[in-house]
Amino acid sequence: MQSKRSRVLVKFSGEALAGENGFGIDTKILGFIASEIRSLVENKIEVGIVIGGGNIIRGVSAAQDGVIRRTSADYMGMLATVINAVAMQEALEHAGLDVRVQSAIELKEICESYIYRRAIRHLEKGRVVIFGAGTGNPFFTTDTAATLRAIEIGANMIIKATKVDGVYDKDPNKFSDAKKLDTLSYEEALDDRIKVMDDTAIALAKDNRLPIVVCNMFKPGNLLKIIQGDNGLCSVVGQRQ
């Protein structure tokens, strides 16, 4: 099964990087993520990464009171994702990995501009590629950006690394009777408004038959086990059976 899943894109939320602080970047979490990604690379898995920017600023929230226009707020959010991407690059390099950051917005003093052919070449050479600045356009989430990049680089799946071990029929943090959904179709994820990703991201994955895997990022070894085929540790959104 692993041979069919040799290239993946992992999506981390910006909030996850903040840890218990709720804001900024917790270097201990960066170090943990780096060790998890390193285990993938050591197992010949090509890895792309997208990180949100919510630990620094969220475009939607910044534009709520009307002082900052939504377009500008979203660009601010894109810059936040680049900050996180550079931090992750440092952590991965500290772990001994070869890493490139590619931004959808030109920031030539800091990182490469996104070129999908170059990204694929980096992956083929065993480098981890971190995609920053979302899609480069306002009004699109980093979930949508992650799905887009996964499709462009030919990833076999997109893994949404979260604080829970999959998708539930309701919030497991609030409801003790919440049931984990091991598998669900794209249509179910869209129609039931289950909080997997935003509708644009799910629809894009559906149109391109890209499996969405939701798992707990804080359990050591989870990412590798899931890529190697242990679906009991996650929820998988895919085509209707």
Swiss-Prot record:
Pfam families, A to Z: AA_kinase (PF00696)
Record-annotated membrane-spanning stretches: none
Catalysed reaction equations from the record: UMP + ATP = UDP + ADP
Role noted for this protein: Catalyzes the reversible phosphorylation of UMP to UDP.
Keywords: Allosteric enzyme, ATP-binding, Cytoplasm, Kinase, Nucleotide-binding, Pyrimidine biosynthesis, Transferase
GO molecular function: ATP binding; UMP kinase activity
Modulation of this protein's activity: Allosterically activated by GTP. Inhibited by UTP.
Protein name (Swiss-Prot/TrEMBL): Uridylate kinase
CDD domains: AAK_UMPK-PyrH-Ec (cd04254)
Keyword Lipoprotein: no
Assembly mode: Homohexamer.
EC number: 2.7.4.22
Pathway annotation from the record: Pyrimidine metabolism; CTP biosynthesis via de novo pathway; UDP from UMP (UMPK route): step 1/1
